[in-house]
Curated annotation (Swiss-Prot):
Name the UniProt record assigns to this protein: Protein-glutamine gamma-glutamyltransferase K
GO terms for biological process, alphabetical: keratinization; positive regulation of cell cycle; positive regulation of keratinocyte proliferation
Cellular component, GO annotation: membrane
Binding annotation for Ca(2+): 519, 521, 568, 573
Gene behind the chain: TGM1
EC number, as in UniProt: 2.3.2.13
Region (Disordered), start-end ranges: 1-68, 89-125
Main function: Catalyzes the cross-linking of proteins and the conjugation of polyamines to proteins. Responsible for cross-linking epidermal proteins during formation of the stratum corneum. Involved in cell proliferation.
Record family assignment: Belongs to the transglutaminase superfamily. Transglutaminase family.
Membrane association type: Lipid-anchor
Residues recorded as bearing Phosphoserine in the entry: 48, 98, 112, 824
PTM note: Palmitoylated.
UniProt remark on cofactor binding: Binds 1 Ca(2+) ion per subunit.
């Protein structure tokens, strides 16, 4: 395996170059690397670097003239409503300006243009003109604006506010303000700002404009003017350039643009008029402001959890989020709509179609990038994408979901990360999971295009849906993992959870696919002597068996299955399934079901850590009043968590005689040496059990997935944590395997504590225990989480976390600047080694 890359380098897998601004493009063919049907698609070859698009030239808006006098845009607009003035109301020409007003900071910032301009554009300041000598946007993290707008945790010095809520600023003038003076604030975004599209905002002080913006004087004292500015709850989100214009009888003055005066505007879940409004403060604290969370994985019976550093307030992350919208070519005028924004994000977090953030890889070969299990957060991924412009290798569902949570929370949408256990992937829109067997009930893998993932991770975000009938507001599913196309591109959602719950698969967006993931049935088909297939068993409670997320204001797991589906087996749940299936490609699938099921079967697997032997058992129960003879076939194989299976490495055939009302078990022992050569990611195995009851003809069928667990890292804080002071953490790991782990890499990350750091530690011997220590300097106070992971070719999915309560620096809150990108990889010697 190649050494880890600190900057994640360039994408190693080819993608079709389809960066278009519209959402409806044709579906391009995709390779299906490392898996057979029913799984996420991924690219397959090394790309040539994608050149950065050339910026479109901005039209010269100062070139028009009438009667020898140029006309500025602002001068052509009425001060009270921004409508066009009459042709005679010409106060002068705006100087030509071709600066870029893109929303992200990936490129260089424009320079200030000097000392201001008058109406004639010659820089002459005449007596009586009102000159703005300076602006204070009160943008410090400790200032009123940032605190009131809940943006004080952003590691930025610029002003960051939320729409629909007033903010304050101060103008410094060349003379005292007079009531006859006319002042207008201007905000511009994009390369070609237009008033009609909301990308050029003119706000006359003391009056509102037709777009809902207002600016009022709150205090005039000497040569200082305090203003309160109110944005509409539907304002475009992004980074705006801010300038000021004044008009007096002596002439017009324009303050030159200063990069320090850029203003970021975000969605506002605290504003009742904003369609992203959330009416629960606890939810806002957790789903918008919480910088870390839990992501669940594994199987329903063996749930694992990992802490993820969302890091939405880290320096550079906000610019990365806005760069994603820019890279997609999303029109600025549509960036005030959270439905459109979240749909674009679901397309752009994966690299297919658009050269987005992450390259998906389910092949098991990650030598040209980072194993998805090695990531501990989103910050390193997003900063690499912002810095290089290239897709980052590699991601799987929990990585796509973790990054999506970061992006949507950063932009102001209440978002949570959701795990669905036994998640179906319906490839033929039948809204059922179809599994095919031969005459002896051995799986026909070449026909099993549908798959059931052990788990799948996606996102819920909260918003109203004005594009749907009433009753579908609230949680909306957004899934950035590239599985199937939607309108020709790899995106999914937003989809109302309420429509999923009731099987209303005709509601947009992508409801049929999401419904099948959580509430379809497993249908078992057996090949008959004439080659046709017959339904022999329908498993109604096998899909979407548990849907969970991190609980609000807690590290506990919350079961949210009930918001996605009615109680399993209830009349409402059956109606939802059959309503949805009626709109699928096999609407009559439930018409040919057989009954007479008096033998029940249950499968259990022993909980074991990787490196240990284990057993699986099948429990049969005869619920009839007569004897039953059951012929059982057990097939054991390894499986990717996406439901794609490897070859069968162990099988067993048994005949079991059950007395009336009795139970019996069939046990299959599995030694470490038997499963170790076959293991793939996540350490999961699949037991296919099929059987035939001699007396009644009943067919038994069951698929049971289980996994061997991986060990955790142990983190210990050595001393107190204070802003600006060096702190030390100790990491201890014991290798559970009898083999050497080679090219071991640790990752360390924590918002407000540690920028993403990569540590190369070499090899770790079989059953060896190692200890290493690392120092870090906290930059923000409060409760924080430091997260670590370990990865090697022989062992992955190893991680740990520690809570760090950071005290403020003496004398204040003690924020420190935390700029800079990820650390490059370093070779770290272990402080101690020992045999376990």
């Amino acid at each position: 395996m190649d050494g880890p890359r600190s900057d994640m380098g360039r994408s190693d897998v080819s993608r079709s170059d389809m960066s278009r601004s519209d959402m409806g493009r044709s579906d391009m063919g995709r390779s299906d690397v490392g898996r057979c049907g029913g799984g996420p698609l991924q690219p397959s070859a090394t790309p040539s670097p994608e050149p950065e698009p050339e910026p479109e030239p901005e039209p010269d808006r100062g070139s028009r003239s009438r009667g020898g006098r140029g006309r500025s845009f602002w001068a052509r607009c009425c001060g009270c409503c921004s409508c066009r003035n009459a042709a005679d109301d010409d106060w002068g020409r705006e100087p030509s300006d071709s600066r870029d007003r893109g929303s992200s900071s990936r490129g260089g910032r424009p320079d200030s243009r000097g000392g201001g301009v008058n109406a004639a554009g010659d820089g002459t300041i005449r007596e009586g003109m009102l000159v703005v000598t300076g602006v204070d946007l009160l943008s410090s993290r400790s200032d009123q604006n940032r605190r009131e707008h809940h943006t004080d945790e952003f590691e930025y010095e610029e002003l960051i506010v939320r729409r629909g809520q007033p903010f304050h600023l101060v103008l410094f003038l060349s003379r005292p303000y007079e009531s006859s003076d006319r002042i207008a604030l201007e905000l511009q975004i994009g390369n070609n700002p237009e008033v009609g599209k909301g990308t050029h905002v003119i706000i006359p002080v003391g009056k509102g404009n037709s777009g809902g913006w207002k600016a009022q004087v709150t205090k005039a004292s000497g040569q200082t003017l305090n203003l309160r500015v109110h944005s509409p709850a539907s304002a475009i989100i992004g980074k705006f350039q801010f300038t000021v214009r004044t008009r007096t009888e002596a002439g017009e003055f324009q303050l030159p643009f200063d990069p320090r005066n850029e203003i970021y505007i975000l969605f506002n879940p605290w504003c009742p008029e904003d369609i992203v409004y959330v009416d629960h403060e606890d939810w806002r604290q957790d789903y918008v402001l919480n910088e870390s969370g839990r992501i669940y994985y594994g199987t329903e019976a063996q749930i694992g959890e990992r802490t993820w550093n969302y890091g939405q307030f880290d320096h550079g992350v906000l610019d990365a989020c806005l760069y994603i919208l820019d890279r997609r070519g999303m029109p600025y005028g549509g960036r005030g709509d959270p439905v459109s924004v979240s749909r674009v994000i679901s397309a752009m977090v994966n690299s297919l179609d658009d050269n987005g953030v992450l390259i998906g890889n389910w092949s098991g070969d990650y030598s040209r990038g980072t194993n998805p299990s090695a990531w501990v957060g989103s910050v390193e991924i997003l900063l690499s994408y912002l810095r290089t412009g290239y897709s980052v290798p590699y991601g799987q569902c929990w990585v796509f979901a973790g990054v999506t949570t970061t992006v949507l929370r950063c932009l102001g949408l209440a978002t949570r990360t959701v795990t669905n256990f036994n998640s179906a992937h319906d490839t033929d829109t039948s809204l059922t999971m179809d599994i095919y067997f031969d005459e002896n009930m051995k799986p026909l893998e070449h026909l099993n295009r549908d798959s059931v993932w052990n788990f799948h991770v996606w996102n819920d975000c909260w918003m109203k849906r004005p594009d749907l009938p009433s009753g579908f507001d609230g949680w909306q599913v957004v899934d950035a993992t590239p599985q199937e196309t939607s309108s020709g591109i790899f995106c999914c959602g937003p989809c109302s959870v309420e429509s999923v719950k009731n099987g209303l698969v005709y509601m947009k967006y992508d409801t049929p696919f999401i419904f099948a993931e959580v509430n379809s049935d497993k249908v078992y088909w057996q090949r008959q002597d004439d080659g046709s297939f017959k339904i022999v068993y329908v498993e109604e409670k096998a899909i979407g068996t548990l849907i969970v997320t991190k609980a609000v204001r807690s590290h506990m797991r919350e079961d949210i299955t009930h918001i996605y589906k009615h109680p399993e087996g209830s009349d409402a749940e059956r109606k939802a399934v059959e309503t949805a299936a009626a709109h699928g490609s096999k609407p009559n699938v439930y018409d040919s079901r057989d009954s007479a099921e008096d033998v029940a079967m249950q499968v259990e697997a022993q909980d074991a850590v990787m490196g240990q032997d284990l057993t699986v058992s099948v429990v049969l129960t005869n619920r009839s009043s007569s004897r039953r003879t059951v012929k059982l076939h057990l097939y054991l194989s390894v499986t990717f968590y996406t439901g794609v299976t490897g070859s069968i490495f162990k099988e067993s055939k048994k005949e079991v005689v059950l007395a009336a009302g009795s139970s019996d078990s069939v046990v299959m022992p599995v030694a470490y040496k038997e499963y170790r050569p076959h293991l793939v990611d996540q350490g999961a195995m699949l037991l296919n059990v099929s059987g035939h009851v001699k007396e009644s003809g009943q067919v038994l069928a069951k698929q049971h997935t289980f996994r061997v667990r991986t060990p955790d890292l142990s983190l210990t804080l050595l001393g107190a944590a204070v802003v600006g002071q060096e702190c030390e953490v100790q990491i201890v790991f014991r290798n559970p395997l009898p083999i050497t782990l080679t090219n071991v890499v640790f990752r360390l990350e924590g918002s407000g504590l540690q920028r993403p750091k990569i540590l190369n530690v070499g090899d770790i011997g079989g059953n060896e225990t190692v200890t290493l220590r690392q120092t870090f300097v906290p930059v923000r106070p409060g409760p924080r989480q430091l997260i670590a992971s370990l990865d090697s070719p022989q062992l992955s999915q190893v991680h740990g976390v520690i809570q760090v309560d950071v005290a403020p620096a003496s004398g204040g809150r003690g924020f420190l600047h935390a700029g800079g990108d990820s650390y490059s990889g370093e070779t770290i010697p272990m402080t101690s080694r020992g045999e376990a």
